[in-house]
Regions:
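Active-site C-terminal subdomain of aminotransferase-like
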Residues: 1-76
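Conserved C-terminal alpha-helix-loop-beta "cap" of PLP-dependent enzymes
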Residues: 56-140
Length: 143
């Protein structure tokens, strides 16, 4: 009996116990894949584009601030907002904005990648309405 189980077990190199994956994680993966395969992606992307536009509307027209829509349709984050600030005009740098957003209530975590002169704000991790909180908080820092 033991030699049969040992022999059969050697050939199993899949997901599950050998990789310390439990039932809950497997159910979670199945649920996530089912959700992804049945979601209306056109509606999902249209909503993200619209919500990105809300941030642009809040920040657009501010002196020393340039905002534009990220429309990388072939990327994994197809929509979002690209924010540039002229520190001489606004008196605040992108790195200052990152630090102040992080220290605020609620904390908002953003970043400016090394060698880039803009902040990319992606909407996918935000709940409906939170894009307005992010846009308003950034606008407060730039006034």
């Amino acid at each position: 009996k033991q030699s049969f189980v040992g022999y059969e077990g050697r050939r199993i190199r899949g997901i599950g116990r050998p990789h310390k994956v439990d039932r809950q994680e497997m159910v979670g993966v199945v649920a996530a894949v089912r959700h992804w395969m049945t979601i209306n992606h056109e509606e999902r992307l249209a909503s993200i584009e619209e919500r990105s536009g809300r941030i642009i509307k809040i920040l657009g027209g501010m002196e020393g601030v340039e905002v534009s829509m990220i429309d990388n349709i072939i990327g994994h984050q197809p929509f979002g907002v690209q924010l540039r600030v002229d520190e001489k005009i606004t008196g605040v740098s992108l790195h200052d904005i990152v630090d102040k957003l992080k220290a605020g209530d609620p904390p908002i975590w953003t970043r400016v990648r090394e060698e880039e002169d803009f902040m990319a704000l992606h909407i996918f991790g935000l709940k409906e309405g939170e894009e307005e909180i992010v846009g308003s908080r950034i606008a407060e820092l730039l006034r």
